Amino acid sequence: MADETNLEGVAAVEATGGEPQREGRGRGRGRGGNDRGGERGGRGRRDDRRGRGNNDEEGGEELIEKLVHINRVSKTVKGGKRFGFAALVVVGDGKGRAGFGKGKAREVPEAITKATAAAKRAMVRVPLKEGRTLHHDGKGRFGAGKVNVRSAPAGTGIIAGGPMRAVFESLGVSDVVTKSVGTSNPYNMIRATFDALTDQTSPKSVAQRRGKKVADLLGRGGASQVEAEAAAEAIAE
């Protein structure tokens, strides 16, 4: 019986690579030695992949970053109060993509960095008319905040105040008329603005959904066929 046990041990050693595993089992082997280094290396590779993914999403383009609001916050712990800062940042590429994010940290620069990273991950695309204004009017709401957004002719400019202006500047909108009702909380105003922007649809997407041509939709407003076709060609996502 002893010989059979030794033979089984030798076979197990040969199967694992030639050297017997003399390290302690369970806790000792799992937390120390080469295994721990391997786990650290694995985490490093995952971080590298995550970094490359963010660069691909940005596409190497320079983003417009707007610091909307920063305030001091506190957290009550056993030893007293811990003070920190909360930042609200809006990020956009100026070509129809924008997002917002918030971050908290003990120092202001770190809070802004966290908020910027969160905003980049939450970017959404909004269809623009002629690359300068919205396709149609819209309403957005979040909490006690309500906003109304309206498309405007060329040369109007951005008629918006506070946090809403930062959103449209980052988005690349140059002509828009807005109005906010209710709370002046910047967090609620930003969320209400994005709620209105996410409801924007272009005539091209509506035509595809209904199985029609863009010129057919634009010609219903009394415009001639030639004018409708010209307007359809001028529409850009």
UniProtKB/Swiss-Prot annotation:
**Record's signal peptide:** none
**Per the UniProt entry, what are the Gene Ontology biological process annotations, in alphabetical order?**
translation
Gene3D superfamilies referenced in this protein's UniProt entry, alphabetically: 3.30.160.20, 3.30.230.10
Which Gene Ontology cellular component annotation is one that this UniProt entry carries? small ribosomal subunit
Residue stretches making up the S5 DRBM domain: 63-126
Q: Where is the composition biased (Basic and acidic residues)?
A: 20-55
Q: Where is this region: Disordered?
A: 1-59
Which Pfam families does the UniProt record give?
A: Ribosomal_S5, Ribosomal_S5_C
Q: Which domain of life is it from?
A: Bacteria
Give a yes or no for keyword Ribonucleoprotein in this entry: yes
Looking up InterPro entries in the UniProt record yields: Ribosomal_Su5_D2-typ_SF, Ribosomal_uS5, Ribosomal_uS5_bac-type, Ribosomal_uS5_C, Ribosomal_uS5_N, Ribosomal_uS5_N_CS, Ribsml_uS5_D2-typ_fold_subgr
Which keywords annotate this record? Ribonucleoprotein, Ribosomal protein, RNA-binding, rRNA-binding
Q: How does it assemble?
A: Part of the 30S ribosomal subunit. Contacts proteins S4 and S8.
The domain section of the record reads:
The N-terminal domain interacts with the head of the 30S subunit; the C-terminal domain interacts with the body and contacts protein S4. The interaction surface between S4 and S5 is involved in control of translational fidelity.
Protein family per UniProt: Belongs to the universal ribosomal protein uS5 family.
Q: What is this protein called?
A: Small ribosomal subunit protein uS5
From which organism does this entry originate? Novosphingobium aromaticivorans (strain ATCC 700278 / DSM 12444 / CCUG 56034 / CIP 105152 / NBRC 16084 / F199)
